[in-house]
């Protein structure tokens, strides 16, 4: 029995009370509020809302066994928060006169709810027909343009022309819903979060004036094969996960679309064809937007400045990427094309950054074109790891090869470095196991990291000019290469442990006059038969 003078059932009061089956409330109860998660997972079958209750909190009756809610005609109830009856078993619901805040998703997952009856005197909501409740976008509005609720057992629906917003979770989990139609004069502007998530619709044609499809709007609609967006559509935004896990086969985007949000088409296992018009205004394709899809080719729209993380991750059928000459693309982000099927790609001049693992672990990538005058400054970690490229051109502006940048590129034989290269650092494992045959050390290179060229067994020649600024060769840098001779430039300061370990073809090491060497590890040339030619003032390093 709820005490007569109790005004509030506090947050979580009866949460997880799995044996609670009955709640008695006095007829003249002073209760005014039922707070968040008050009765979560309770086994009560019915509940009468006292007349003075003004608010029911978020998830208050979530996962309850409740089937019947009694709300008196004179109820003062004004607000039902999000997910208040989430996954409950209610079958019928009355919206009283004073109800003005029926929050989005209030009956999410309540799949037995077939009838919602609105008081004729309610100022904000009304029944459109026996299946639909409509509402005003704000309490001040006089226009009923928001679809608030739909019968959870409905099989087909035509959205009234005057509806401008389909509210959050309006049709979510309507497992019998197979058909949604919009009239030619539809005024629909927005489909909100999870509006048709997990329905059984098979196709949909969007109205012209639609500007936004919210996150999860059609997510997990496993029978959805066809979406039609008119060429003159006003659609601007496709939200996160909007079509994730659908069976869409083709999609054509309108020119005015500006944003495809993260994972919008992830796991669309039938999506092979994506059409983007040449005059597209698309400005952002966010993280993982098309990951794990079988798309076969893609043209990067001209105004895209960044290909975000994981956008084409695991797109194993993706063979061709086209970047137009007027492209504004500047950044290819982390794992953007990770494990995809691209065979070749031409990097435009204005690209400034290719991030970690952007092209790594390709089974088919054989050719990548980068112009010498490219604005690219750094080749990040594992950018081209385990690709099949056989040649690479390094632009003059590149200052650093990060670790494992070309590791295990087992076809890479030729590295073209611009004569005016600004390269300063080659980090650890950068070319590990690559079969390159010759390498030119750029004049401004200061450091060769550990294992940088280790196990490059075809590497016989390393060219170093008289003007070289090379200062440090770290441990195992040239381990197990086939270098025949090597000249240590005068600016070199440190030759670390096992730098040339097991270089069995190495015959001559020449250390220049006027050298600045401060340290040579005793095993730097271990397991070689090289003759070391040193200035007389350096003999003490080898005594």
What are these regions (language model features)?
Residues 143-145:
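Short coil-to-beta-strand
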Residues 1-8, 18-33, 42-55, 64-79, ...:
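Structural signature of tandem-repeat unit edges
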Residues 10-15, 35-38, 57-60, 81-84, ...:
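Consensus positions within tandem repeat domains that build extended binding/scaffold surfaces
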């Amino acid at each position: 029995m709820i005490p007569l003078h109790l005004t509030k059932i506090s947050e979580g009061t009866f949460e997880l009370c799995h044996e609670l089956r009955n709640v008695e409330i006095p007829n003249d109860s002073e209760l005014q509020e039922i707070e968040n998660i008050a009765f979560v997972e309770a086994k009560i079958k019915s509940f009468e809302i006292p007349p003075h209750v003004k608010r029911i909190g978020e998830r208050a009756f979530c996962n309850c066994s409740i089937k019947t809610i009694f709300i008196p005609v004179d109820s003062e109830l004004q607000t039902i928060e999000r997910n208040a009856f989430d996954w409950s078993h209610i079958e019928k619901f009355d919206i009283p006169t004073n109800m003005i805040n029926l929050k989005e998703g209030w009956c999410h997952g309540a799949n037995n709810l077939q009838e919602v009856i609105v008081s004729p005197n309610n100022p904000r909501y009304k029944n459109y027909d026996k299946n639909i409740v409509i509402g005003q976008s704000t309490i001040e509005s006089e226009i009923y343009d928001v679809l608030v609720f739909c019968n959870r057992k409905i099989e087909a629906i035509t959205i009234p022309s005057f509806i401008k917003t389909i509210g959050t979770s309006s049709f979510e989990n309507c497992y019998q819903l197979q058909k949604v139609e919009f009239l030619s004069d539809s005024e629909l502007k927005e489909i909100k979060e999870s509006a048709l998530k997990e329905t059984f619709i098979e196709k949909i044609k969007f109205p012209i004036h639609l500007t936004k499809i919210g996150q999860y709007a059609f997510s997990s609609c496993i029978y959805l094969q066809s979406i039609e967006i008119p060429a003159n559509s006003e659609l601007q935004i496709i939200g996160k996960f909007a079509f994730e896990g659908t069976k869409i086969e083709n999609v054509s985007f309108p020119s005015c679309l500006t944003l495809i949000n993260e994972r919008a088409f992830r796991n669309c296992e039938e999506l092979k064809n994506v059409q983007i018009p040449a005059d597209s205004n698309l400005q952002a394709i966010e993280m993982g937007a098309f990951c794990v899809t079988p798309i076969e080719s893609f043209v990067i729209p001209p105004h895209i400045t960044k290909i975000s993380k994981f956008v084409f991750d695991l797109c194993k059928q993706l063979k061709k990427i086209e970047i137009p000459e007027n492209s504004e693309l500047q950044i290819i982000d982390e794992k953007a094309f990770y494990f995809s099927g691209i065979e070749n790609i031409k990097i435009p001049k204005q690209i400034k950054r290719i991030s970690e693992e952007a092209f790594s672990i390709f089974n088919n990538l054989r050719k990548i074109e980068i112009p010498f005058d490219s604005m690219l400054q750094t080749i990040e970690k594992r950018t081209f790891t385990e690709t099949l490229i056989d040649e690479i051109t390094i632009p003059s502006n590149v200052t650093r090869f990060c670790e494992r940048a070309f590791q295990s590129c087992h076809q890479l034989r030729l590295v073209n470095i611009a004569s005016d290269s600004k390269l300063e650092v080659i980090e650890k494992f950068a070319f590990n196991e690559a079969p390159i045959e010759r390498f030119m050390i750029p004049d401004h290179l200061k450091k060769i990291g550990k294992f940088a060229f280790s196990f490059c067994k075809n590497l016989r020649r390393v060219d170093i000019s008289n003007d070289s600024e090379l200062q440090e060769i770290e441990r195992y840098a040239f381990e197990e290469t086939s270098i025949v001779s090597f000249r240590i430039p005068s600016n070199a300061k440190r030759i670390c442990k096992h730098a040339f370990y097991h270089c069995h073809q190495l015959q001559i090491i020449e250390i220049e006059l006027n050298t600045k060497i401060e340290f040579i590890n005793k095993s730097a040339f271990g397991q070689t038969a090289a003759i070391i030619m040193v200035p007389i003032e350096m003999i003490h390093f080898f005594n």
